[in-house]
């Protein structure tokens, strides 16, 4: 049994092998582009009429037929199968069934090469807008959580070793800043997505007197591509998006890893609520952090799609090659993954975590994270910082050997170490003072954190 004929089949003497037809077809996934394909075709029909290539009546017939296909698809009445090959042929075939011979005029002065490029750009432009909205909601959620934890202290880490205490809000604000960079990257990428390839033809333009600026305007593009060859072969915009998507996933994955650690009994900084955790099939005591674990795992999918497209594109000569069909599943899955992870993480941060403030307070009281402040104290008294640093290092070593903390030293012991120490050393090394004192711009001091929260909310309002 042979595959059904395609618009290009008149060139061939034999029908395509059914297995090859299945292998070649993209309708199973590029049907996602149908709404954008219909909009692009309607704009193309209007342009054909404007330039006199078809009559206004023919254009109106095409536009109405395309709109009927849209309604059929939305109602679940148009479900093309493998015989269509791709979304473009599926639409063209159905259009001709609906409006007759005039349907065959739609593809005048157009190739599937510029058609699919237009569809993908329209799709990605829309998805970027959705992701930007999600990122702003992600920021709002983090800011709301941070607002309630300005004076909640949490150990800060370097090398996953206790380093200096922080305001929990300051820690959360770091992820707000990461999301801000994600937003800025996507907005820049959107500008490069928003260029129209429609009318570039297969690769060299067309002999018809088309108006590419008109179709670009109708579809909301800022301009048409300046080079037809570049227009049909460019996938930079997909790769750029995958780069930005990968960084979004990096940021979500880093926070996910921290939440997984914080939720463990070894840290016990947070408890997971029932609405955002799962259990074990065999261990009844378990409460598993599946959301952050899945986000951490799914990041690899997006990274893989980026790598796949880079490897695919590096060896392609100009202009269009069938390899480019592989961009869509990678792009679609990356979009779906990023959107799902942003939604899940936003819910998790809004209602899935309860920070254990007593445990956090005990944690920042039980280590040497205030050692830098002892060195700073001496430096403020005129002792060279490096000398102060070395002295405090020796003190920490002694305290570890004696199983006590810096706060446990008597004033006599402090002054025996250096005469510059006074009674105010105890206030200086209290965790809350340690945090409050770091009031330099961008620091974890409470005043700075409140200013940072206000500035972040102002940025959100500006959008």
From Swiss-Prot:
Instruction: List keywords of the entry alphabetically.
Output: Amino-acid biosynthesis, Arginine biosynthesis, Cytoplasm, Lyase
Recorded catalytic activity of this chain's protein: 2-(N(omega)-L-arginino)succinate = fumarate + L-arginine
Where found, per UniProt? Cytoplasm
- Provide the E.C. number(s) assigned to this enzyme: 4.3.2.1
Question: InterPro entries annotated for this entry?
Answer: Arg_succ_lyase_C (IPR029419), Argininosuccinate_lyase (IPR009049), Fumarase/histidase_N (IPR024083), Fumarate_lyase_CS (IPR020557), Fumarate_lyase_fam (IPR000362), Fumarate_lyase_N (IPR022761), L-Aspartase-like (IPR008948)
State the similarity comment.
Answer: Belongs to the lyase 1 family. Argininosuccinate lyase subfamily.
Q: What is the protein's name according to its record?
A: Argininosuccinate lyase
Q: Which organism is this protein's natural source?
A: Thermosynechococcus vestitus (strain NIES-2133 / IAM M-273 / BP-1)
